[in-house]
Amino acid sequence: LFANVKINQRVVETGFEKLFVAPPMTDDGTALGAAWHVLSGDPNFNPKPLHSMYLGPSYSKEEIGSQVAEKKIQVRKPVDPAKEIASILAKGGVVALYQGAAEFGPRALGNRSILASATDPEINQTLNERLNRTEFMPFAPISRMEDAEQLYKNICRVQHSAEFMTVTVDCS
């Protein structure tokens, strides 16, 4: 149920002051949910906010280099990756981003992500066709944290959940 980001938005709109949906809200989070449930009965339990879901596997430069060589993939390292990515996206290109540890849970949060410009009205269809994805698979915007309140309505009520793509908000 809570994997449905639109339902999570509607829950907030019923009057909740704040909502946090645990990022691994599917089968892979069952053990975490069970642990939180048991701990919630302990009066000394003091939960802390989650700061990262980059808990999956990561690979050394040597392991990556070995696979790149074996698959004969061309690789180049830009001097300024952010600037290079922005330039590719501005020209309508698509970027596959692979860095650090993989995300734990069902959402691509930037370490295993495909980036594309949202200004192309056909981009959802294009990506779905290229990736063999179904039409209803969600896409999410990336924006700077300092711009969030200006861009998204009621973001203050769900900001922590939004960082993990577990809720939607309307755009301003």
Show the residue positions of the predicted features:
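Flexible beta->alpha loop and helix N-cap segments adjacent to enzyme active/binding sites
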Residues: 2-172
